[in-house]
Structure formats: structure tokens, C-alpha cells
Amino acid sequence: MKKLVKSAVVFAGLVFIGTSATMITEKASAASTDPVQKVDGQATYIPKGVRDGTATEEHDGFEDGTNSVLQQVPLLRATTGYPDVNAYIKSNKFSTAKIEKQLKSQFPKFNYRNGYGKPEGIVIHETANNSSTITGEINYMSTNYNNAFVHAFVDKSRIIQIHPTENGVWGAGQYANARFIQVELVRSKTFDEFARSINNYAYYAAYLLDQYNLPVDSAHSDGKGTVWSHDAVTRYLGGTTHTDPVAYFNQWGYNFNNFVSLINEKYKAMQVNYEKIEYDKAITAYSRVKTATGNSVWTKPNKTEGAKLVNPLSSYSGKNLRIIREAKTSGGTIWYQFSVGGKTIGWVDSKALNTFYTPSMEKTITGTRYVLPSKQTVHYYGLPVEDSAIDRGPLSKFNGQALTLQREATIEGQLWYRVKDLGWVKAVNLTTTKYDLIEYDKAITAYSRVKTAAGNYVWSKPNKTEGAKQGSALSTYSGKNMRIIREAKTSSGTIWYQFSIDGKTIGWVDTKALNTFYTPSMEKNLTATRYVAPGQETQHYYGLPVADSAIDRGPLSKFAGQTLTVQREATIEGQLWYRVKDLGWTKASTLTATQYDKLEYDKAITAYSRVKTATGNSVWTKPYRTSGYKLVNPLSSYAGKNLRIIREAKTSSGIWYQFSVGGKTIGWVDSKALNTFYTPSMEKTITGTRYVLPSKQTVHYYGLPVEDSAIDRGPLSKFNGQALTLQREATIEGQLWYRVKDLGWVKAANLTTTKYDTLSYDKAITAYSRVKTATGNSVWTKPNKIEGAQKISALSTYSGKNMRILREAKTSSGTIWYQFSVGGKTIGWVETKALNTFYTPSMEKNLTATRYVLTSKKNEHYYGLPVVDSAIDRGPLSKFSGKTLTVQREATIEGQLWYRVKDLGWTKAANLSAKKQ
């Protein structure tokens, strides 16, 4: 399709007639107002790209290969030096290409202006692209079809149809698009290729005209006919400006009249005499489409006189075609006339169908059957095919009747029976068993329990009805509340109940096996006001007056304190139930006519309080004026005690505390009567490390910062010397407490930041020492690094003195300490390594001897221990002059022998004599 020409040609005989661009425009304009051009829904025939403004007819991407202006060309054959094309074709006896189909599903489908399958002719195009190929053109058009597309492409060796010719295309402007089949010719590079392509083109054009019973009539010169050049469309119809294929034909010494002449020759060769009908008879059969491609439906057998196209056979794919007549034509083809849904459609080649029913498939049988109750709505038919045209109605008319079988037929693997005086029905809809029928099946509401389990079962459907299967023994459900959801009566007169348990449908049971304890008929109207009884808030209400989890609507706590309107009552198994408006059913015992204080909340808390105002306050089992509250004691009974607050509740009269004492829960008291000295809000987060003060090992720690035996966790001694991690602190009544990780609460005064040594042991001993190393050593009030140890003096103060050792202690650091006295006065503690011990009792030995005080030594003294120490000086020996002294022990102290005399003490051996003086 060339661009808008500035001159064009009209062929008439051998005369050349030039037409200016102005004339073409005028004719096109005139054509556009011709009533014959007006088509309903004309926009359908305009390419989408043009409608959207993304393309124009002049610039649609197709046939835009040259901008050259066409020159005047001769009507018949230009003197180009090429042979006569038509003669060349005949002399070479070219064959024609096979018609290929590559239909593009993405192309839009729309009918011609006169309807589906009713083209009025054909438009001859050429591609205007010297370098393209037939596949390249098709591929490009397949992507850009919104700008333009045609029915087929032709080249030297192929004819490829890409769109059904029964539908229109977008190839030559809206007026041609509404009327014509359109075919593109791919350009050739040699004369021989051109001639071969023209041969294929003319054949295909003739084939299409013959297919649609259209004559060969050129519209090139007068705008009337069935064979149109694109150029003629421009000049006579409008809606386009292209002029192909005139210039391209002229390039090879060819013109449009030559082409129409070749079409006419091929068209005539296709014409044949009408076939005759050898027979035409009524038959009965059913078929479906087997091969839709290439087959159509005709008003009469095709190629017989008067045969016209009805529809492509594909229109009836998947449908049951009732074959009503069979005809054979002189060409040997057998044709079937068929109807669909009772309406006669037309004739089709029998080879295009698959026949699935003929009367020859039937066999004679005898037998009796009954309609399956579940198949009452299934229909029966005049023939063994589901076809609305022979539908005789539902099987329900014959419920319970004995049906006499006469014939059977297996149609597509499915067995059908013909019933006497009835018709055909699928065998699966009938049964040899006469089942009970359901006379009624209705929803009801009731509750029952098993009365007679023996011999009774649960069924999937009422027993003896179609499909009923035995389930478990009824005894499985003994003692359970069975909600009755449906009631059915069978034709045998038995009434059956369908029941559920806990919301799950179980099955059907004979009503005689049950005892029904609730039906709606037991209910009575009632008008009353009630309140949820305190203490009953956890009781539930239900959809019906039965405690069944499947209809449980939740606890009554949602309605505590609300005024409830009672509408109905029912006594179920001796127990009165109320139905509350907008609520449901609950036992009457859960409600009360008295309105108590309502608990707005009741929550666990942690606190400690003491009695602030005992006068006029009491302790109650529940918050005062709530349901079930009773007096426990006057509050004064707990004055001065630590009350642990464990719950807080709010009523319309105030806030109440529940408390315990010594771990025992006591009751509830008005919070205003107490002074709260601890709540968790008093706590603060801290970090730090502490150690147990050794002197506080017996002190206890607690679960909270309060000294309460109920939360006493034991003595701190378990944690001596351990680093304790602080987490929180609280000042309770002026006293600081610490919470220790993994431990609990302890008063801060029991801990220290210093890690003291602890005493491994501390025992009384007897010894005497003197200072060995004074330098760097001191005397302490306690062993150094023990809690409370204070320095007294330098050890050098006591150098040279006899230090009586009173006690020995060992600390956790491994050091051994001595507590000593000098002159009978206790001084302090000193590390043992700083001393030289010259006496210990271990130095003593037993001895038995008699001695006498030497006269010269009667003024010497004796001592409590073998050491000269004024603190243990017992006096002069003169008291015992002349007396016999019994020696019991001896000890050598610093090289000097001492004797211990019975009932006397120690004295140096030198003071005594073995002989009496």
C-alpha cells in the first residue's frame, strides 16, 4: 500500500486515463457520504492503533516502503522487455502452492457488515518492501496487528492464511475492512519469482471467490465488483490513501486487468457440475464433532444445487448433534443433517463426526428396577442421550414404582435402560432394591439421651433409605447430651432423629431409642429482672437450656452488675433455666433478684500495710456488699501487724484490699483503713556489689523488703564471702533495703562494700610468747581484716615482755592469730608469725616425785604456769617450808626446769630439794 499518490491511474480497455490527486480526494470524499458505506458499529473496522492515535492509515507500518510518486502507467503491459506474465505461467505449467494455515489467536475477531462468513469480495495488496520475506511479514504483523492485519500472505512458493476469512480484518480502511477478504503479495526479486507468486495469488483469489460463491468481477475501473485493488478502494470507497499493487505490477510489465483475467481462468477451472443426491432418508443417531478444521455446515449437502454455508462446524464442537437424516451424493460422500437442542441446523460431511449412538447398539433385556431415592431429580429421555430436546422430565414421578426394563444400550461406556412406558434412563439412577422413601426431612431443635442402646445403631442416613450405612453402636453415646438437629419420617412409618454431640454431627437414630428431655414446647413466657449472682460470674450461658459446649456462649462475668431481662423459663430435668433477652439461657440459680455491688475489677497486687483506723472497720470474706460477703473479724485484731496485700478490688463503694498475715489469707478490708508502707513503685533499679557483714550472718533475707515470716528465706550465712549483685533498692519506713540477684531482699545495714575475712575458728588456748618480729606488725582489737578490727598499737610496745596467749583464731585468708595479755590485762590480737612461743602445755611431762622447799629459796614464788608472770604469781614458797611437796609434772622452759606441785602450782626445780632440810 503506497503512500498518498499525487497521480493515479484507471484502466479502461487500452486507453490510459490520468486522474489527479484532487480528483481522487473528491471521489473518496463522495464515497464516504454514500449510504452504502455506512455500517453499524463502524469504529470496529478502524484499527485500534488509529483509534488510539498511535498510528495513521498512511503510517501504519505496512506497505509504506516507498515515498515515490506513481507515474502514469499503461493499462495493459508496459514496454519493459519482460515476457507476458500470464503466457509465461501457462507455458511453464506452474503448479500452485498448498494453502497453509497459521491462524493467529491474538488477532481481534469481528464480523463483516453483512455478518459472519459473508465477505463481498477480495482486496489485492502488495507489501511495498523489496527486502522482506513472507515469514518476516507475518512475524511483523503478528506483533503490530493493532495497526493493521490481513487474512493471508502469498509469495513465489507459499500461500499462508493467518486469519479466518469468515471474519473481517484491518487492511484497507474502515469501508473495505467491513466488506472484503484481504491478501498481501510479497515482492519478488526476479521475473520468474514474480510470475510464480502471481500464479499462486490468482489461484488463491479464485479459491476464495469460489468458496463464498462470489463471481469474478473487477472493481478496479468502476468501483463495483468483487476483485478490488487497494488503489480502487482509495478511489471509490475512501478511508485509505494507498495505491498498491498498480506500480509493483507495472515494474514487471503487468497490470491489474491481466491479473483479473488470470483469476477468471483459474476460477472457471474450479467450477464443477452440481452433485446429485442418490438417496435422502430419515435416521436416528447422535454424534459429536470429530474434525472441525476444514469442515462447515451447509443448508444442503455441499456441492449440490442450492447449498449455502451456514456456519463453520467448530461452532458445534462438544455438543450432542442429533442426526435426523442421511444423504449420499453422486461424489460418494455421505452427509448427515443434524439438530441441536431440537433445532435443525444443517448438513455436514459424516466423516467429520464421531457417532456415539445408533439404534443398533440396543439389546433386548428383561428385569425390574426402582428409582434410587437420591436420583429423583435426574431426568429420563426419549433416547439414551442427555438432550434437552428429548427430555421427558424427572424420575420423581415414579418413586417407589416397579419399573419394567425392555432394552439396554452402552453409550460411551455408560449403561442405559429403556423402561416400559417411560423412556431411557442411565442404569446408575435405578436400583434392584426397593428403599424406604423419605416422606419428610425437617430441621428441629431438641435434646435427648440414649434410652435403649441394645439393638440400636447410628446410621449415616435413616436406615433402609438409599445410601444408609451402619455406624457405631448407639451405646457409644450413652449418657451424653445429644442435640437433635433434624427429624425425618420414612415410608415405613419410622421417625428418625439426626443428632450432634459437642457441635459435631454424628448420624441418625430411631427416635424410639431415645429419651428427649428438652424441646422448645417446654418453654414458657416470663417477665422478670435478674442480676448475675456474685460468685456465679464463672458460670456460663448457652444458646439453649442445656449445658452443651457446642452452644456455650461464654461466662456470665460479662454481665456482672447489669440488669438482665428474663423473657422465658423452662424446667429441664428438674432444674429451672431462664432465657435472658439478648443473652441466652442460664440456670436460674446463677442469677439473683438482689443487686449487689459489682466488682469493677479484681486483680493481684503486692504491697504491705498496717492498720491505720481500726474503729468502725472490719475484715470480710469478700469485698463488703458483694455477693457472699461475711464478717471475719474486727480490723483491730490485726493492729500493729504487717499485713501483706495480695489482691485489690474495686466496687461501687470503693477500693478493697485482701490481705494475709504470717502467710495465711485473712480477708478483705477497706483500703482507706490501712496505711501502706510498701509497694513495688517504691523500688529503684541500681547496680553494685556487696558482701555479708560477718557479724550479720544470722540475720535473714526476705522475698520482699519487709520482715515477714511468710517470706523469710533464711539466714545470710549461706552467702558469707560471696560477691552479691545488687539489682534494686527501696527505702521502707526510713530503712534502706537491697534486692540481691538470685537472693531476695535484705537490709542494707547487713551488707558491706568491703570483703572481710571470716573466722575459720576461734578457741581458748594457753601459751606464752615474746615478740620475735616487731617491725611491720601491730596489735589489733580483732584479727586484722575481720569485721570491726581496729589497730591498738605497734607490736614493739611489748617487746621483751612475757605475753600470755589466751586465744587462737584462724581467718579465711589462712592467717593464725593470738590474743594475748600482759600483766593480767588483755591487750589484743597479733599474728603468730611475729611471736616466739616459749611455752605451751605440750612441753609438760608427767612426773612423780617428792620435794621440799630449800631453806634458801623460801622467798621464791610459785605460779599458775611455768612462767614468771605477776598475773599468775601465787605467792612465796615460805608457806610450804618443811612440808612434803608432791611433784606431778615437769617442763623445761627456756632451758630451766620447772615442777608442778600438787595443790600448789609451778615453781622452778632449783627452788626445791629431794631432801628435807
Curated annotation (Swiss-Prot):
UniProt protein name: Protein Ami
All residue ranges annotated as the N-acetylmuramoyl-L-alanine amidase domain in the record: 118-245
Domain of life: Bacteria
Locations listed in the record: Cell surface; Cell membrane
Role played: A bacteriolysin able to lyse both L.monocytogenes and S.aureus.
Organism: Listeria monocytogenes serotype 1/2a (strain EGD / Mackaness)
Keyword Cell wall biogenesis/degradation among UniProt keywords: yes
Protein keywords: Cell membrane, Cell wall biogenesis/degradation, Hydrolase, Membrane, Repeat, Signal
Gene inactivation effect: Decrease in lytic activity on L.monocytogenes and S.aureus. Decreased adhesion to mammalian host cells, however no change in host invasion and host intracellular growth.
One Pfam family hit: GW
SMART domains for the chain: Ami_2 (SM00644)
Signal peptide: 1-30
Gene Ontology biological process: adhesion of symbiont to host epithelial cell; cell wall organization; peptidoglycan catabolic process
All copies of domain GW, residue ranges: 279-358, 361-435, 440-519, 522-596, 601-679, 682-756, 761-840, 843-917
Family as reported in the entry's similarity comment: In the N-terminal section; belongs to the N-acetylmuramoyl-L-alanine amidase 2 family.
Region (GW repeat region, necessary and sufficient for cell surface attachment): 262-917
PROSITE patterns, per database record: GW
Gene Ontology, cellular component aspect: cell surface; plasma membrane
EC class (word): hydrolase
EC number in record: 3.2.1.-
Domain remarks in the Swiss-Prot or TrEMBL record: The C-terminus has 8 GW repeats.
Gene Ontology molecular-function annotations: N-acetylmuramoyl-L-alanine amidase activity
